[in-house]
Regions:
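Nucleic-acid modification enzymes, centered on SAM-dependent nucleic-acid methyltransferases
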Residues: 1-164
Length: 167
């Protein structure tokens, strides 16, 4: 993947690889949290990461082709390119949005609160993110989010509570 020069193609294959890691690792797929399979289950598993990579790649290519067909039907593709603007920004939810731009959609982590048993998207993402170079994701973000399996969830909920201390 790293030898591919085209960033869009690399990103496609990083997505494939992320799913392959989830499907073939020794982590249980029955939960979003990182829980190792039992030693017996690990010993008895017969999975091929390479075969899984091929299957997921082919499925995702088919899905993209189907999506492109829908965009073409709606005349949103011209000369092989999407004609609308889409901009994605990485932001910190604890800091005020400083922009004069208008936006149609703001996506945030769901408000799943302080409960330690809630869905942990960070743990779900942690293993695949160990493989993907930060510059292929977004060069403006810090890799501090990988310092522990809980850090992504902490950051996506606005970090830790800050006390107002008067000097």
């Amino acid at each position: 993947i790293r030898r591919e020069e085209n960033l869009s193609i690399r990103k496609f294959f990083w997505i494939v690889m992320a799913e392959v890691i989830r499907l073939t690792s020794n982590d249980r797929t029955s939960t979003f949290k990182l829980h190792a399979r039992s030693p017996e289950e690990i010993q008895n598993r017969n999975v091929s990461a390479l075969n899984c990579f091929k299957i997921v790649s082919k499925r995702n290519i088919k899905d993209i082709a189907s999506y492109i067909s829908v965009l073409e039907e709606k005349e949103l593709i011209k000369n092989g390119k999407y004609i609308k603007n889409a901009e994605v920004k990485w932001a910190d939810t604890s800091i005020k949005i400083k922009s004069k731009k208008k936006f149609n959609l703001l996506v945030t982590s769901p408000p799943y609160g302080e409960n330690q048993t809630t869905v942990t998207y960070g743990q779900f993402s942690y293993l695949p993110l160990q493989w993907i170079p930060i510059n292929d994701i977004d060069s403006t973000i810090s890799i501090d989010y990988l310092k522990s399996t809980q850090e992504i969830d902490t950051q996506s909920l606005g970090g830790t509570k800050k006390l107002n201390i008067e000097e």
